[in-house]
Amino acid sequence: MSLKRRFLRRILPPALAFFLRMLLATVRVRELGRAERLPGIQGRKRLIFAFWHNEMVPVVGFYAGRDIQSMASRSFDGEVIADTLIRLGYPAPTRGSSSNNGRQALKALARGLREGRDVVLTPDGPMGPRHKVQSGVLTLARLTGYQLVPLAFRCRPAIKLGGWDRMEIPLPFAKGCAIFANPITVPRECSEEEMDALRDHLEETLRTIDEQAVRLLSSRAA
């Protein structure tokens, strides 16, 4: 690792964690569907949450400190993200991705579920295509038997960054809307055609609740 990267690796995580804590403390968030749709709230059955990669900032900032297992790639960006998440109070993320050490990463996430932690994944990460579900999140739900919960978390006003995912960062004192959809069960004995149908269903659900969150934030009811 170059001297520049070692320097950035040292200063970025604490700076990002501080920034996210301060920023999200000013955001007024409205949660929809969490209490009435999630069986884990009552019985504490663990769940797998899926949200688009461009909504990572409000999700990890608002739910900081929760006992939630996540995943970060083995790239330099993944190193920075992993260290930032730890500083935000999350357990150390599982390292890997669908294209790099994916099988071992899924096993580690499954172990986290068995040990009593919820799991969060971005089904279009770590490098896209944007808003296209990859197989990893569905495979994890199929192999473990834990339900998959689509989540949308949008904020307004927000700035949109460049890059493949067009990540959004809420501005101070923004309004936020987090919508939890109905849990999805992926049968263990699932054919390729059924997996394709579930992938389409997850994509459509994420798209629908994402649009719903934007509409609510644009209305006076938000």
Indicate residue ranges for each PLM-predicted region.
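A transmembrane-helix-recognition feature enriched in membrane-embedded lipid enzymes
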Residues: 1-33
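A short, well-structured juxtamembrane/interface segment
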Residues: 21-46, 52-58
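Catalytic core of membrane glycerolipid acyltransferases/transacylases, capturing the structured
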Residues: 46-100
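Short gly/pro/ser/thr-enriched loop/turn and capping motifs at secondary-structure boundaries
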Residues: 77-79, 101-102, 127-129, 155-160
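Hydrophobic beta-strand scaffold residues
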Residues: 92-93, 119, 148
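Catalytic-site beta-strand/loop segments enriched in glycine and acidic/polar residues
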Residues: 108-140, 144, 201
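A cross-family acyltransferase "interaction/gating" segment
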Residues: 132-192
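Charged phosphate-binding loop/patch that engages nucleotide di/tri-phosphates or the phosphate backbone
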Residues: 200-222
